[in-house]
Amino acid sequence: VSPFKASNLSSSWYMTGSGAPVGVGQAFQAFASGIAPDADMGPFILKPENGKVIRYLRGRPCDLSVEESVSEALSSFDSLSGRYDLVVCEGSGSPAELNLKGSDIANMRMVRERDIPAVIVGDIERGGVFAAIYGTWKLMPEEERRHLRGFIINRFRGDISVLNPGIEELESMTGMRCF
């Protein structure tokens, strides 16, 4: 199993054995999977520097078009897919940010390009988890929803029965399972 995140906003990175950086999160996930971190696990790193965000591709500053960026991200994903039985793709932020639809390479673009099954993960600690999950689902066009396999509510602690009415309503409204 290999982690993958096409684009990662991070102020630090981990240097791989080949000398190319990868996001610290992807390095940690790789170690947890028992494999060595690889730059293909996170080809793009957006690093805040001096009040700006500098975009790096495998450790080198870059200024690529969206299509060139997608091509690079797909190349990294394909490389990992050829070496591992399973590649777990992590998105970045929300897959339904209307203002970023045309330039987002880390979320549904990867899913659509490689027909990757997806789940929406909602963070209960931020509050409004059912509204966030349902709103995200509702904003997604049907061509993207067809890739969804369900929802996950993250960071819940306590008696799960407290969530059951909300889970049942969410599943009824969307026809999708909440895991």
What are these regions (language model features)?
Residues V1-F179:
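Flexible phosphate-sensing "switch/lid" loops adjacent to ATP/NTP-binding sites
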